[in-house]
Amino acid sequence: MAVPKKRTSKTRTNRRRAQKKARAPQFVECPQCREKKLPHRICQSCGHYKGEEIIEV
């Protein structure tokens, strides 16, 4: 079995784990109704996406 030759330092471990932090979602404004929505998603309040009505709300 493979075994590490050197011990991984605390700093190196922490640097690697720093990439796994949770980030707050970024919201954008819907151009139709001005509500906050996630980017590249259908607006939940008006049902528009890329200027077209996808679902009737």
Curated annotation (Swiss-Prot):
The UniProt keyword set, sorted, is: Ribonucleoprotein, Ribosomal protein
Q: Which gene encodes it?
A: rpmF
**GO CC annotation, single:** large ribosomal subunit
Segments of this protein annotated with the region Disordered = 1-23
Highest taxon above the source species: Bacteria
Q: Name one GO biological process term.
A: translation
Name the chain's protein.
Large ribosomal subunit protein bL32
Q: Which Pfam families match?
A: Ribosomal_L32p (PF01783)
Concerning InterPro entries, the annotation shows: Ribosomal_bL32, Ribosomal_bL32_bact, Ribosomal_zn-bd
SUPFAM superfamilies per UniProt? Zn-binding ribosomal proteins (SSF57829)
Q: Which family does the similarity line name? A: Belongs to the bacterial ribosomal protein bL32 family.
Any one GO molecular function term: structural constituent of ribosome
What PANTHER family does its record include?
Answer: 50S RIBOSOMAL PROTEIN L32, LARGE RIBOSOMAL SUBUNIT PROTEIN BL32
